[in-house]
């Protein structure tokens, strides 16, 4: 029991630290000498990297952020943690990405890391959400709209997949976290002022 509790706490800490790896911030600093927290949307995620650093760095940041989430839950699975502890490890990674200790608790909007988490937990659901994201972005070319639609679809897809209650609950929590992080984007979407891909405005 003590060993299991220690392992769980260790994985939660590792999950948070993985999520807190500031890939977007480092891309801005190393490649352009800028602090992404002071640029565009203020997010350190791939979308803000795309707008302020470039396409190549944005793709690398996206892949790293996906990897952070996937690695966290795969580590939890590899040591035999139950479903609830797996999802808590995933949420720890999500929290690390949104509130990284290294950057004054100001990070990304959790979309890429969230995708990684659900690819690790239930890859068919993760792929379905990514497909939904890509379908919306190909039509409207608005990243935030695609993120919001995918976030709303996530718990529904998880429920329909017949996954465990732990996975369904974490999908709902993650969805709400992503929507909360996109609240200003949602306001602009409703106002019709949210920028499309390629724009330099806030996003």
Swiss-Prot record:
TM region positions: 1-21, 84-104, 117-137, 157-179
Tell me if Cell membrane is a UniProt keyword of this record.
Answer: yes
List, alphabetically, the Pfam families matched.
G3P_acyltransf (PF02660)
Give the record's pathway. Answer: Lipid metabolism; phospholipid metabolism
Which reactions does this protein catalyse?
an acyl phosphate + sn-glycerol 3-phosphate = a 1-acyl-sn-glycero-3-phosphate + phosphate
Membrane topology category: Multi-pass membrane protein
Instruction: Provide the function of this protein.
Output: Catalyzes the transfer of an acyl group from acyl-phosphate (acyl-PO(4)) to glycerol-3-phosphate (G3P) to form lysophosphatidic acid (LPA). This enzyme utilizes acyl-phosphate as fatty acyl donor, but not acyl-CoA or acyl-ACP.
What is the recorded name of this protein?
Answer: Glycerol-3-phosphate acyltransferase
The organism named in the record is: Synechococcus sp. (strain CC9605)
Q: Its gene?
A: plsY
